[in-house]
């Protein structure tokens, strides 16, 4: 999405593993980060990882809040792993020439995009499916793209080594706890990620 220093990044699902990473990467790149997160514990996690502002979509109008925080301009880049209503609101609070990065649909609803909104504000919507780069399924990235992914990982590791990325582990479970972990994720009770650890009662 070519996020530049001084731009505004809106991160949906900011208390999830990818959302928290997006908040930290945005801050490391010099962006002003606005996060959406439901509940005070998740909002606190987003702030702790670098969000300047947190909006609770269960209690606030996301579009109105983003426009208010940006002086009516909107967000330059939107990171969206949620889809559904949050994607709909993002379309209406993205700045002219803005970019929306869609990586998943945790809400359970794949949004439909009114193309006229893209046209009148010159907005780009960018899809990112990780399996394409990892050669899952029939579609595979070219060697040149895979080389680019290695470069990006090198940048991420450099940020981690510099202390700018702090992966959040909600809890560790044995492999036999997979169903419990999945249930917690589905119930939206997780901040960061759940790690399944081989061994213990799985030995």
Regions found by a protein language model. Give the residues of each.
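Short internal alpha-helix immediately C-terminal to a glycine-rich phosphate-binding loop
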Residues: 1-29
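Local beta-strand N-terminus motif with an aromatic residue
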Residues: 6, 51, 74-75, 87, ...
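N-terminal Rossmann-like NAD(P) cofactor-binding module of classical short-chain dehydrogenase/reductase
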Residues: 10, 78-79, 101
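NAD(P)H cofactor-binding loop motif with strongest signal on the N-terminal glycine-rich segment
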Residues: 13-14, 82, 105
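Adenosine-nucleotide cofactor-binding segment
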Residues: 27-89
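Glycine-rich phosphate-binding loop and adjacent beta-alpha segment
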Residues: 85-164, 197-203
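C-terminal capping/lid region of NAD(P)-dependent oxidoreductase domains
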Residues: 157, 161-172, 179-203
């Amino acid at each position: 999405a070519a996020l530049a220093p001084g731009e505004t990044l809106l991160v949906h699902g900011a208390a999830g593993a990818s959302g928290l990473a997006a908040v930290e990467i945005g801050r490391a790149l010099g962006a002003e980060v606005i996060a959406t997160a439901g509940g005070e514990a998740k909002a606190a996690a987003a702030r702790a990882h670098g969000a300047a502002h947190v909006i609770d979509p269960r209690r606030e109008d996301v579009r109105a809040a983003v426009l208010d925080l940006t002086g009516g301009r909107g967000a330059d880049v939107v990171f969206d792993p949620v889809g559904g209503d949050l994607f709909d609101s993002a379309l209406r609070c993205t700045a002219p020439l803005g970019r929306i990065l869609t990586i998943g649909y945790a809400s359970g609803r794949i949004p439909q995009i009114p193309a006229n909104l893209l046209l009148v504000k010159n907005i780009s919507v960018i899809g990112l499916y990780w399996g394409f780069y990892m050669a899952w399924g029939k579609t595979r990235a070219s060697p040149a793209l895979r080389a680019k992914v290695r470069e990006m990982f090198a940048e991420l590791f450099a940020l981690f080594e510099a202390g700018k990325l702090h992966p959040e582990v909600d809890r560790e479970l044995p492999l036999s706890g997979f169903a419990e972990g999945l249930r917690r994720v589905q119930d939206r009770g997780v901040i960061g990620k759940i790690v399944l650890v081989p061994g213990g009662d799985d030995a």
